[in-house]
A protein has these predicted regions:
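Residues in the helix-turn-helix
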Residues: 44
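C-terminal all-alpha effector/ligand-binding and dimerization domain
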Residues: 98-243
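Extreme N-terminal segment that seeds HTH/winged-HTH DNA-binding domains in transcriptional regulators
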Residues: 1-40
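Short, cationic-aromatic polyanion-contact patches
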Residues: 4-6, 30, 67-81
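A generic "binding-loop/recognition-motif" signal
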Residues: 64, 86, 163
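Beta-hairpin "wing" of winged helix-turn-helix
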Residues: 22, 54-63, 69
Length: 243
């Protein structure tokens, strides 16, 4: 089954749900109708619907159909089970995004950096500090470490636009999975400066540290994302397994 067909059906249905083409609690068109609409096999359609179920967008009901259960988040929300860029998350939630590069440099990983990034000592990387704005408000300060050998030609201009778009559509990299750790850490002076936080109101940050791998099993990125605590939200959809 071609992945591109399944992906295109999944993305189209997801966009229609997000844009209220199918209203909340409304049943989606029947399976046969969707098969005719997308000119696909039953298995291909069911795989796309299964992913929407995993995302928490729809719920299948035996003998009745597929019901839309999607409700948009009040604030921008990243999805725990998916890898998406800041721009993709903003677009999905209906917000305007902007990224500013504060620092773009190159160096080799030292022993201290190797402990928290996962890169080996001596590995050449691009180090980037980026400030992400949502609707003109600074929300996330990113510390990005990208493996130079895996992302040749990376520039500050690309970093201000979309690094993942460059990786996938120019370098044709397949991004497969990301290991994430979420912690609460003390706010630093850099956090306070760039995220416009008042130390009297906030003394902690929500921090997401991630190691991301491509289809060759190579870790090409370590990123520490430092989020404004008043706008931090990660979304997950949990399913109870039957005994």
């Amino acid at each position: 089954m071609p992945k591109s067909i399944y992906e295109s059906i999944y993305k189209d249905l997801k966009q229609k749900i997000e844009r209220d083409v199918f209203a909340y609690q409304e049943l989606l068109p029947s399976e046969n109708t969707l098969i005719q609409t997308y000119h696909c096999s039953r298995n291909t359609l069911r795989r796309a619907v299964s992913r929407l179920v995993s995302d928490g967008y729809v719920q299948t009901m035996q003998g009745k159909g597929v019901r839309n259960i999607y409700q948009p988040a009040a604030q921008t929300a990243f999805t725990i089970g998916e890898i998406e860029s800041f721009r993709e998350s903003a677009l999905r939630n209906g917000h305007q995004s902007l990224t500013k590069v504060l620092l773009f440099t190159e160096f080799a990983i030292n022993e201290k950096q190797a402990l928290y990034t996962g890169f080996s000592v001596g590995t050449d990387i691009y180090y980037i500090q980026r400030l992400h704005y949502l609707d003109d408000m600074p929300l996330i300060l990113n510390h990005n470490y990208f493996l130079k050998a895996a992302v040749p030609g990376l520039t500050p201009e690309i970093a201000e636009n979309s690094i993942y778009d460059y990786l996938e559509n120019t370098l044709h990299m397949t991004i497969v999975n990301s290991k994430r750790i979420m912690t609460v850490e003390k706010m630093t002076q850099i956090d306070e400066k760039y995220l416009k936080l008042n130390a009297e109101d906030y003394n902690c940050m929500a921090v997401v540290s991630s190691q991301t791998y491509n289809s060759d099993g190579v870790m090409f990125e370590y990123t520490q994302s430092r989020h404004r605590p008043d706008y931090f939200r990660f979304y997950d959809n949990a399913v109870r397994k039957s005994n």
